[in-house]
Amino acid sequence: MYLLNNLALDLDAIFTQINLIYVLTACALAMSMGVFLAKKQARTFNEQGYAGADTATKGSENLPNVNFFEYGDMRFLHLGTPAVQGSMQISKPFDIHLEYVQRMMGWLLFADLNQVSHLQAMQMGLGAASLTKFCHMHLGMQTTAVELNPQVVAMCRLRFNLPQDNAKLQVIVGDAAEIAGQEKWRGKIDALQVDLSDQDAICPVLDSEAFYADCRQLLTANGCMTVNLFGRKANIDRSVQKIANAFGKDTLWSFKRTKAGNTILLAFRAPRTWDKNALLSQAQAIQVRWPLPAAKWLKVLAPVH
């Protein structure tokens, strides 16, 4: 009996190891297939001319490979490193589940909710397309996304439920810095969402006062830029100062830093004031309309002093 018990335990251990090897192998194959398909689609963009491309993708051959990983109901986007560049809940592909990405929608607290579908949104940095899909699918906004890496666009279309371009959705394969400086976009954007990082996700890749000044010029009179700041606190403080120099410090509101290390900053084209009761009513109205935890935002959002 002792030998049989030991044999059973050994067999369980062997089968556990086999299952683990099987899962890891399946994940590796899925990631490899994702890279292959994304590269193939990216080549199609470059060879045939991508309809949404307003600027050339310079040095695209040096951009990182794009892959994905699945765990349960979650799918994660990677740029060839362990750093997560975005994610999607497979059962709710058009919702936003990451806390810091939800906070990128904080501009809704200051918007006329009855007019949101008539506004224009722009995302600089596509990631897993969470913001782009939410603005397009849930809010019905005119939505433009700017992404440097054509493999990211291909992967989002293949694995992250990003719709094809249509009358209210455009994905531009190009440089966000160039787009920000283009005259055609000035004064047109109501909600500008900036989340730009490289494959290591250590700090924003575009973080100059000049870039933020160009971003300000894109906004309508009541427009708002939300930007994801991450990295060391000293670096975040420097970024806030650059944005303050470009926008004016009295236009800035900030969320407290998330546990994951993300600080979401709101920068308005012009200063905004709102009393606590009005913000609470607005947050409750947002929650009724859309799957966003807006009431929780009020506990961690305040003007920058």
Which positions does each model-derived feature cover?
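Short, strongly hydrophobic alpha-helical membrane anchors
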Residues: 1-17
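Structural signature of hydrophobic alpha-helical transmembrane segments
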Residues: 19-22
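N-terminal signal-anchor transmembrane alpha helix of single-pass membrane proteins
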Residues: 24-38
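Short, basic/glycine-rich phosphate-binding loops at helix/coil junctions
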Residues: 80-87, 192
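A short, flexible beta-alpha/helix-coil linker loop
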Residues: 83-86, 197-200, 225
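C-terminal substrate-binding/active-site "lid" region of AdoMet-derived donor-dependent transferases
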Residues: 209-274
